[in-house]
Amino acid sequence: MATARPSIVGPDSGPESPFPYKMEGKVISGFGRGSKELGIPTANLPVDATISPWISSISSGVYYGWASLQLPPSHPESPSSSSCSPYVVFPMVMSIGYNPFYNNTERSAEVHILHKFTADFYDAPMRLLILGFIRDEKNYDSLEALVKDINTDCDVARTSLDRKAWVPQGGLLHPAVDVREKQGDLDGSWLVRPNDSPSA
């Protein structure tokens, strides 16, 4: 009998060391399976240890946190012209690893943003503030079992992020993000910082 998975991960007090991790780049096309086979579209980033040196040493598995996107003005989810930042912030869950069910030979970073987009955003700049770990990477006997676990990952990420210590300060979230508290205690300023500002 399968062991029941926890519905929430991480302490109420907020992310613990070594988190958060930061990752950024332009959204690239992946294997084309997220939407077609799984019904769970992904926005992928290149795995580049020269940009994200920590990625070589962390476990392959499922992580969660916040993603910010710099969408073109023509995109339906693009921020209004009155917004102080070109970035919009959404909750996300992501896989870092080889996806053994598909026998991948290269490590990938596949991000599922927890929002239903009405248009693609390939090549858009994306930043990730990775706050915690959900589970190890594993193989599956069937596609159905894989999809079930991914959907559970999404639920765990939503619930885990919907706490005051995990929600960014300053009302940074896109208006469509459904959380109880729109303003939390987490420093998420890097997610929306202009490109010409110094990094933290």
Curated annotation (Swiss-Prot):
Q: Which UniProt keywords apply?
A: ATP-binding, Flavoprotein, FMN, Kinase, Magnesium, Metal-binding, Nucleotide-binding, Transferase, Zinc
Disulfide bond residue pairs:
none
Comment on bound cofactor: Zinc or magnesium.
Q: Which pathway, metabolic or otherwise, does it act in?
A: Cofactor biosynthesis; FMN biosynthesis; FMN from riboflavin (ATP route): step 1/1
Disordered as annotated region, ranges: 1-20
Source domain of life: Eukaryota
The record's listing under Pfam families reads: Flavokinase
- Record's GO cellular component, any one? mitochondrion
As for family, the record states: Belongs to the flavokinase family.
**Any idea what this protein is called?**
Riboflavin kinase
Query: What gene is behind this protein?
Result: FMN1
